[in-house]
Design a protein with these regions (language model features):
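Conserved alpha/beta-domain cores
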Residues: 29-178
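Conformationally flexible catalytic loops at phosphate/diphosphate-handling active centers
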Residues: 1
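Long, charged amphipathic helices and adjacent flexible linkers at domain junctions
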Residues: 6-42
Length: 178
């Protein structure tokens, strides 16, 4: 988020309007909690949430989500400003898995790169937008990848955890990740 000190009237009115719109939207969605999630032709859907932190699990479940479809684990890096230890990761992943239990949780392995946390990425990339990110970064830095996988495995005591590997483009990348 951002902090605006001493906003002018136009800025203040803009944020008051945004807050009002968000409140109205949240109120409309609140009326849907507990109702079946189906397409217009009656096909049932499973509604899962995408989250950035353990605190968001509770809100997702209260909103009627049937699990956590994606945990953006790279946000742990952004929040801390560094790569966390395996123990710190295990604690974070365990907190999320326990809050969601018995619902499933899908953790996406660190998807760092051009738009997010760049520590450990070479300064020159041929194509920074598509270059060394996702699984390619994790294969480039096996120490980080292995630490994260170990932490996720240690956090899986309730067996409600799934793993997503980001941006796999080739069969070779998948085989290397195994």
């Amino acid at each position: 988020g951002i902090v605006i000190v001493d906003p002018d009237n136009d800025t203040l009115n803009e944020y008051i309007k945004k807050h009002r719109q968000a409140t109205e939207y949240r109120d409309r969605l609140g009326g849907l909690v507990g109702k079946p999630t189906v397409t217009t032709d009656g096909i049932p859907l499973v509604l899962k949430a995408n989250i950035d932190s353990p605190e968001q699990v509770d809100a997702a479940i209260m909103a009627g989500c049937e699990g956590i479809g994606l945990v953006r684990t790279e946000m742990l890096l952004v929040q801390r400003g560094r790569y966390p230890s395996a123990d710190e990761q295990t604690e974070w992943y365990s907190d999320i898995a326990q809050r969601a239990y018995p619902l499933s949780v899908t953790f996406r392995a660190f998807d760092v790169g051009s738009d997010k946390f760049r520590e450990g990425i070479p300064h020159h990339e041929e194509n920074p937008a598509l270059g060394l990110r996702g699984i390619r970064f994790l294969l480039y830095r096996p120490d980080i990848f292995e630490s994260q996988i170990c932490a996720i495995l240690q956090a899986s005591v309730h067996r409600n955890i799934r793993l997503m590997l980001p941006m796999i483009a080739t069969l070779e990348e998948l085989e290397q990740a195994k």
